[in-house]
Amino acid sequence: MPSDNLPHAVDAESPLKEAELQVLRNQYEKEGQFVGVQTKFNYAWGLIKSDKRPEQQMGVRLLTDIFRDHTERRRECLYYLALGNYKLGNYAEARRYNDRLLENEPANLQSQSLRGLIDDKVAKEGMLGVAIISGVALAAGLVGSALWRGMSRRR
């Protein structure tokens, strides 16, 4: 299946208008327990695009259901599960889903682009973590030094 029909990761950053998402929600709710896979997928896609974390989480849950129950939709689900987890900050999960897609489609440009975004975020957060740990260590060293000097003066 060609990879050019998947959107680029940056497209997921622009949420649907509330009225557009409501159309998808209404259709999903209207179909109830007999909801079709396409309706569920469309609603999950709209939720993933949201800028509201609870909606993104629900979108990931719906996509997980589709991935588990409908093998013919797994390819699309892999990409959107990677995208949804990326937006939620679940970078290990995002990478896992994205890498699975890349195993089958190494030339998939959208998935390659998403891999770069995931790697950049992981690197930035890693650097932030190192900076925080370094700052805490420095502060502890300064406090320890001050206490040591204070104890030395009392002797």
From Swiss-Prot:
Protein name: Mitochondrial fission 1 protein
Gene responsible for this protein: FIS1
Sorted UniProt keywords: Membrane, Mitochondrion, Mitochondrion outer membrane, Repeat, TPR repeat, Transmembrane, Transmembrane helix
Main location: mitochondrion
A Pfam cross-reference name: Fis1_TPR_N
Highest rank taxon of the organism: Eukaryota
Side of membrane Mitochondrial intermembrane, spans: 149-155
Subcellular location: Mitochondrion outer membrane
Organism: Tuber borchii
Positions annotated as TPR repeat: 75-108
Bilayer topology: Single-pass membrane protein
